[in-house]
Amino acid sequence: TVVSQVILKADDELRYPSSGELKSITEFLQTGEQRVRIAQ
């Protein structure tokens, strides 16, 4: 998922996620309900 990809990339580079990466996680989490509805 987007969340694990962002965390793993930052971890590999020995840094915290950037503000842009954190924003992409936030957007991913905010659209979760919509993705679940589509999947049903």
Swiss-Prot record:
One GO process term, biological-process aspect: photosynthesis
Q: Which UniProt keywords apply?
A: Antenna complex, Bile pigment, Chromophore, Electron transport, Membrane, Photosynthesis, Phycobilisome, Thylakoid, Transport
Under Pfam families, the record lists: Phycobilisome
Give the UniProt subcellular location, in the record's own words: Cellular thylakoid membrane
Q: Which InterPro entries match?
A: Globin-like_sf (IPR009050), Phycobilisome_asu/bsu (IPR012128), Phycobilisome_asu/bsu_sf (IPR038719)
> Does the record's keyword annotation contain Transport?
yes
Q: Name one GO cellular component term.
A: phycobilisome
- Subcellular location, principal: membrane
Q: How is it modified after translation?
A: Contains one covalently linked bilin chromophore.
Indicate the family of this protein. Belongs to the phycobiliprotein family.
Protein name from the UniProt record: Allophycocyanin alpha-B chain
